C-alpha cells in the first residue's frame, strides 16, 4: 500500500478561481511537498500534494498536458479531468526548472506509450476499428519513464535507511568557564541538529502515511459496495432456487438449474470470503497507520521538550559568557595593580641599595 515518490520538491500550491478563471487562490498556507507518484493499480503517474491529511493536488499526467513557466519561480498546468488549473510557486528558479524537466519527461513517456498502443491497435484491428480506437491511451510503465527498475531503486529506498537514536551519555564537567561554555554550545547544537533531521524524516513518512490512508479508505469503500452487490445477488439466487423447487412439473430441469445456482452461490460465497479477508487486512493497515500517527505525535512532543531545553541551555550559555567576561576584567585589573606594585617595589629596592652603599662608604671613611 502506498507507492514511494519518484521525485519530490516543495512549493506553494495555488488553483485558478473557478468563478473568474483569472485570479489565483492559494490552497496551502505554507510550502508543502509536491511529489510524482507511480500508481501501480491503474498504471499511471500522478502529481500528489498533501496539506496535513487533505489532498490539495491529485492530478493524473496525460500526453496532452503542458507545464508553463509564467515567471522565474512560478509555473502552471491545466488538468481537464479535475476541471482546474494548478499553480506552483517555488523558492528558486532551479527548483522550478527541475520540476518542469520531470513533467516533460513523464509527458513524453505518456506520448510514446500512446503511440505504441496505437501501433498495436493498427496491427490487430480492422480498418473500422482503427478509426474508432485512435483515442485510446496505453498505461504508463515505470520502465518507460526511468529506463530500468535498477535506476529507480535508489529513489524508492532512500528513506528506508535506519535512523540513529540520540545519545544519552552525560558529558564530563569542564574545569574552566570557557570549557563549560564550549561544551554546552556543542551539546545544544548536536541535539538541535538531530531533532531537525528526525522531524524532516517524520514529515516525509507522514506524507506517505496520509496517501496510504486515503488509498486504503477508497479501497474499503469499494470492497463494501462490491460486498453488498454480491450479497444481493446471493439472496436473489437463493430465492430463485426456492421458486424452482416449488415447480414439481419441471423437477429435472429445476434440479439441474439448482445445481448450477448452488455452484454459483458457492462461488459468490467464496468471493465474499476473500473480500471480507481483504477488508480485514485493510482495517489492520489502518490500525498500523494510526499507531504510526501516535508515534509521530510522541516524537513531536519530544521535539518540543528538546526545544525548551535548548532555550534553557542558551540562557545558561549567555550567563556563563557574562561571568567569563567579568572574570577576565577582574584578572586584567589584578594584573594592572600587580604591575604597579612591582614598580613601587623596584623603586624601594633601588633606594635601599643606595642607602646600603652610602652606609658602607661611611663605615670605610670612619
Swiss-Prot record:
Modified residues (N-acetylglycine): 2
Main location: cytoplasm
Coiled-coil features, chain-numbered ranges: 193-364
InterPro entries for this protein: Homer (IPR045027), Homer_EVH1 (IPR044100), PH-like_dom_sf (IPR011993), WH1/EVH1_dom (IPR000697)
Location within or outside the cell: Cytoplasm; Postsynaptic density; Synapse; Cell projection, Dendritic spine
Region (Required for tetramerization): 302-366
Keywords of this entry: Acetylation, Cell projection, Coiled coil, Cytoplasm, Phosphoprotein, Synapse
Domain WH1: 2-110
Positions where Phosphoserine occurs in the chain: 318
Ranges of biased composition (kind: Polar residues): 138-147, 155-170
GO CC, one annotated term: glutamatergic synapse
GO terms, biological process: behavioral response to cocaine; G protein-coupled glutamate receptor signaling pathway; positive regulation of calcium ion transport; protein tetramerization; regulation of calcium ion import; regulation of dendritic spine maintenance; regulation of store-operated calcium entry; regulation of synaptic transmission, glutamatergic
Region of interest (Disordered), ranges: 114-189
Subunit structure: Tetramer; this tetrameric structure is critical for forming the high-order complex with SHANK1, which in turn is necessary for the structural and functional integrity of dendritic spines. Isoform 1, isoform 2 and isoform 3 encode a coiled-coil structure that mediates homo- and heteromultimerization. Interacts with GRM1, GRM5, ITPR1, DNM3, RYR1, RYR2 and SHANK3. Interacts with IFT57 and OPHN1. Interacts with SHANK1; forms high-order polymerized complex with a mesh-like network structure, at least composed of SHANK1, HOMER1 and DLGAP1; the complex formation is SHANK1 multimerization dependent.
Assigned protein family: Belongs to the Homer family.
Domain notes: The WH1 domain interacts with the PPXXF motif in GRM1, GRM5, RYR1, RYR2, ITPR1, SHANK 1 and SHANK3. The coiled-Coil domain forms an antiparallel tetrameric arrangement.
Protein name: Homer protein homolog 1
Amino acid at each position: 500500500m502506498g507507492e514511494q515518490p519518484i521525485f519530490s520538491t516543495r512549493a506553494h500550491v495555488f488553483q485558478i478561481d473557478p468563478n473568474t478563471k483569472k485570479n489565483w487562490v492559494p490552497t496551502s498556507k505554507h510550502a508543502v511537498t509536491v511529489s510524482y507518484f507511480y500508481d501501480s493499480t491503474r498504471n499511471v503517474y500522478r502529481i500528489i500534494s498533501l496539506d496535513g491529511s487533505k489532498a490539495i493536488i491529485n492530478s493524473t499526467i496525460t500526453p496532452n498536458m503542458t507545464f508553463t513557466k509564467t515567471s522565474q519561480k512560478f509555473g502552471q498546468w491545466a488538468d481537464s479531468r479535475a476541471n482546474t488549473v494548478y499553480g506552483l510557486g517555488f523558492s528558486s528558479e532551479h527548483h522550478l526548472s527541475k520540476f518542469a524537466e520531470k513533467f516533460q519527461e513523464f509527458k513524453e513517456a505518456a506520448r510514446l506509450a500512446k503511440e505504441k498502443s496505437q501501433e498495436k491497435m493498427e496491427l490487430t484491428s480492422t480498418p473500422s476499428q482503427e478509426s474508432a480506437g485512435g483515442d485510446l491511451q496505453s498505461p504508463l510503465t515505470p520502465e518507460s519513464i526511468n529506463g530500468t527498475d535498477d535506476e529507480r531503486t535508489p529513489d524508492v529506498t532512500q528513506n528506508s535507511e535506519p535512523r540513529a537514536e540520540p545519545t544519552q551519555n552525560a558529558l564530563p564537567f569542564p574545569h574552566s568557564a570557557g570549557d563549560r561554555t564550549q561544551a554546552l554550545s556543542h551539546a545544544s547544537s548536536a541535539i538541535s541538529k538531530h531533532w531537525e533531521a528526525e522531524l524532516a524524516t517524520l514529515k516525509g513518512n507522514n506524507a506517505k502515511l496520509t496517501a496510504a490512508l486515503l488509498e486504503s479508505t477508497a479501497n474499503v469503500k469499494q470492497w463494501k459496495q462490491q460486498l453488498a452487490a454480491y450479497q444481493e445477488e446471493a439472496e436473489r439466487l437463493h430465492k430463485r432456487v426456492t421458486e424452482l423447487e416449488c415447480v414439481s412439473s419441471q423437477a429435472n430441469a429445476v434440479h439441474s438449474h439448482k445445481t448450477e445456482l448452488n455452484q454459483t452461490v458457492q462461488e459468490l460465497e467464496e468471493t465474499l470470503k476473500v473480500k471480507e479477508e481483504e477488508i480485514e487486512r485493510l482495517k489492520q493497515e489502518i490500525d498500523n497507520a494510526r499507531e504510526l500517527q501516535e508515534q509521530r505525535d510522541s516524537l513531536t512532543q519530544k521535539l518540543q521538550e528538546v526545544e525548551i531545553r535548548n532555550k534553557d541551555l542558551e540562557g545558561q550559555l549567555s550567563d556563563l559568557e557574562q561571568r567569563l567576561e567579568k572574570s577576565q576584567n577582574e584578572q586584567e585589573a589584578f594584573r594592572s595593580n600587580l604591575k604597579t606594585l612591582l614598580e613601587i617595589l623596584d623603586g624601594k629596592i633601588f633606594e635601599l641599595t643606595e642607602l646600603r652603599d652610602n652606609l658602607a662608604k661611611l663605615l670605610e671613611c670612619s
